[in-house]
Structure formats: C-alpha cells, structure tokens
Amino acid sequence: MQLLDGKALSLEIEAKVKEEVMILTSSRGVTPGLAVILVGSDPASQAYVNMKAKACKRAGIYSITHEMPESTTESQLLNAISILNNDPNIDGILVQLPLPKHINTAKVLEAIAPHKDVDGFHPQNVGRLTSNLGGFAPATPMGVMRLLQKYGIDPQGKNAVIVGASNIVGKPMASLLLNANATTTLCHIYTKDLASHTQNADILCVGVGKPNLITESMVKKGAVVIDIGINRLEDGSLVGDVDFASVAPKCSYITPVPGGVGPMTIASLLENTLKAAKTRQETPQS
C-alpha cells in the first residue's frame, strides 16, 4: 500500500504556479487576480476562504475577499458579481458555498462570467467538461486526476466507481474519469447494494460526508481508493468517508485524510486562476 501524498504534490504545483505567475508578470505586466465572495459568517467557510487567500499570496496571485452579511439579498450578490465580471484586474471569481437559503445558488453560479468561473460550476463549463472540450474543471476532481497522474495511475480501461453524485465533486469526477477512458459508475443515495458496485472498482472515489461509510469488505484487493470526504468527529479529529485503518492494507494506493485530496483542491484552484489569466491575455474579452 502506498499513500497518495496530496500535500507534497500540492507544494510542487504551487511552486510551478508561482514560477509561471512571475513569468507572466515580468513579460506582460499581468498579475493573475482572484476574487472570493463570502456571504455570512459560517466558520468552516471562513476557514476555507482564508486558506485560499494564503495560498494565493504564496503563489504571487492577487486575491481579494468580499465579505457580505448573511442578510445580503440575491440582487445585491448578483450586482457584486456583475462588478467583478467587468473588473479587468480580476481573472477568477469564486462564490464560497453553501449560500444562505434565501439565495438561489444556481442563479448565482450562472451569473459568473464563464471565462472567470475558476470553480467550474457555470453550466457552460459543466457542458464543456461533459463534452471533453476543455474549459474549467472543478478544483477537487481536477486535483484527484492530478494525483492519479503523478503516481502513474492510468484510468484507461479501469472500472472507476464514484460514491456521491454532487455537482461539485461526484458528477465532474465521473466526467473526468470517463474522459480518461475509464468505465465509470456513479453511485448515489438511491443506489441499491452499494457494496456490489464498490467491490468491482479498480479506482474508488468517495465523497459524501459520512465517516466510515466504506469498510474493508467493500473494497477489492489492490484497488486505488480516493477519499474525498472530510468529517470532523466529536473529539475534534478529521476523518474521511473511508475506514482508513481497515481499508488501507487492502489497497495499492490510498489518500490519507487530512493531507490527501484537500491540499490538491487549493492547488487546482491556483492552476485554474493562472489559466484564466493566461486565456484572458491571449483572447481579450469584450
């Protein structure tokens, strides 16, 4: 069993992004810019936003956080996005989820200009991903693919099973693996006999937010297990969705939690922001 070290790879990617940002700045006078919008004061969301801001600073990317109160109306949020869409200093726009219940999340994500949608949630980018036409892929699934690539794990011809069908992780993960020529199965809350699917997986990706959902008997020997879940237990410890102690000895590769997929999400966001800046320079937006 070998650990897929997302922390180490994320540092490699961050260093490469920093180098490319320096080249872009020195050759074209351009510094990539990321705007993050945070509505409300959810502690977990604030922590994620702070992590993104620190990563941007380390990589030389200009970042700004717009903190808006919980009482912010949908129209106020849409107006803030419109201003950022037209801001020449901003290449990427990210709205931290979840949003308060009175705001229509789909409408907000659709309001972000597709060429600034570094989260890859705009329907145009979702469609491009599904059709394998480029665009922006969501950061977490993109980070998983980079991990597989780093460790020489080729999805082509393999049975890939994804547990969790969210728009943020599960569905784009399935699209990326399908684009890489894996035979892809997407499981969700209504899937019958989950184990019968997971036991057939050469590559198993799990992201639902349930500690110990995947146990040793549900995984075949030699599988690659990607634990995308992150759960804080009552004792304060962080665990994934996979029972690591029992499953790990059975795997060829497995991601730890923390230190696996999490750091890769931030690294992929930096990559997407750099990509947005480069694309904007090559194809000026009207």
UniProtKB/Swiss-Prot annotation:
UniProt-listed Enzyme Commission number(s): 1.5.1.5, 3.5.4.9
UniProt keywords, alphabetically: Amino-acid biosynthesis, Histidine biosynthesis, Hydrolase, Methionine biosynthesis, Multifunctional enzyme, NADP, One-carbon metabolism, Oxidoreductase, Purine biosynthesis
Cellular compartments per GO CC: cytosol
Binding site for NADP(+): 164-166, 189, 230
Coiled-coil region(s): none
Family matches, as SUPFAM superfamilies: Aminoacid dehydrogenase-like, N-terminal domain, NAD(P)-binding Rossmann-fold domains
Gene Ontology MF terms in the entry: methenyltetrahydrofolate cyclohydrolase activity; methylenetetrahydrofolate dehydrogenase (NADP+) activity
Domain of life: Bacteria
GO biological process: L-histidine biosynthetic process; methionine biosynthetic process; purine nucleotide biosynthetic process; tetrahydrofolate interconversion
Pathway membership: One-carbon metabolism; tetrahydrofolate interconversion
Gene3D superfamilies: Leucine Dehydrogenase, chain A, domain 1, NAD(P)-binding Rossmann-like Domain
Signal peptide span: none
NCBIfam families with a match to the protein in the record: PRK10792.1, PRK14186.1, PRK14191.1
Subunit architecture: Homodimer.
Function field: Catalyzes the oxidation of 5,10-methylenetetrahydrofolate to 5,10-methenyltetrahydrofolate and then the hydrolysis of 5,10-methenyltetrahydrofolate to 10-formyltetrahydrofolate.
Protein name (Swiss-Prot/TrEMBL): Bifunctional protein FolD
Origin species: Wolinella succinogenes (strain ATCC 29543 / DSM 1740 / CCUG 13145 / JCM 31913 / LMG 7466 / NCTC 11488 / FDC 602W) (Vibrio succinogenes)
